[in-house]
Amino acid sequence: MKNVIDPFISLSYWPSAGGFGSNTNILETNIINPSVVLSVLIYFGKGVLSNLLDNRKQKILNTIRNSEELCKGAIDQLEKARARLREVEMIGDEIRVNGDSQVEREKEDLINAASENLEQLEDPKNETIYSEQQRAIDQIRQQVSRQALRRTIGTLNSRFKIELHLRTINQNIGLFRTMMNTPD
């Protein structure tokens, strides 16, 4: 056992070499050691740092590209929707103006025709005038009802399903037949 302890005892007599530590005095330090450490850190750290920055840059660029594409798609869809809205508004305005002006024209034409007929006829022909007025009024009613029916059918065609539309038509035909068969 003595042989095992002897080497440790002899170590206690050796003078210590100073050990590791940091020397903050620049004049006492070896300038080569810190420069080597700094060079190694810069050399290896530069590659890692540049890779991290490149990856981050690519992610940012991809995000920007995706955002721009989504924005362009949304703008295109918005423009298409606006163009479609303008078309529909113009068509609606045309239908409204044409329908109203046609009804007014026909009404004015019939009133003018009735007025002319009244001017041409004299007092003894009041019955003829009355019948012509009734005919003109009936024509106006028919034309107005036709126009209203056309508009109603257009509205029904666009709003109801075909089954409901057919059921409504059949009910109206039945009502019309009963009205035609019923004497006044």
Curated annotation (Swiss-Prot):
GO cellular component term of the entry, any: chloroplast thylakoid membrane
Pfam families assigned: ATP-synt_B
InterPro entries: ATP_synth_b/b'su_bac/chlpt
Keyword Metal-binding: no
UniProt topology in membrane: Single-pass membrane protein
Disulfide feature: none
Main location: plastid
Keywords, sorted A to Z: ATP synthesis, ATP-binding, CF(0), Chloroplast, Hydrogen ion transport, Ion transport, Membrane, Nucleotide-binding, Plastid, Thylakoid, Transmembrane, Transmembrane helix, Transport
Superkingdom: Eukaryota
Subcellular location: Plastid, Chloroplast thylakoid membrane
Membrane spanning stretches: 31-49
UniProt GO MF annotations: ATP binding; proton-transporting ATP synthase activity, rotational mechanism
Other notes: In plastids the F-type ATPase is also known as CF(1)CF(0).
Entry-linked HAMAP family: ATP_synth_b_bprime (MF_01398)
Family, as annotated: Belongs to the ATPase B chain family.
Subunit text: F-type ATPases have 2 components, F(1) - the catalytic core - and F(0) - the membrane proton channel. F(1) has five subunits: alpha(3), beta(3), gamma(1), delta(1), epsilon(1). F(0) has four main subunits: a(1), b(1), b'(1) and c(10-14). The alpha and beta chains form an alternating ring which encloses part of the gamma chain. F(1) is attached to F(0) by a central stalk formed by the gamma and epsilon chains, while a peripheral stalk is formed by the delta, b and b' chains.
Function: F(1)F(0) ATP synthase produces ATP from ADP in the presence of a proton or sodium gradient. F-type ATPases consist of two structural domains, F(1) containing the extramembraneous catalytic core and F(0) containing the membrane proton channel, linked together by a central stalk and a peripheral stalk. During catalysis, ATP synthesis in the catalytic domain of F(1) is coupled via a rotary mechanism of the central stalk subunits to proton translocation.
Protein name, as recorded: ATP synthase subunit b, chloroplastic
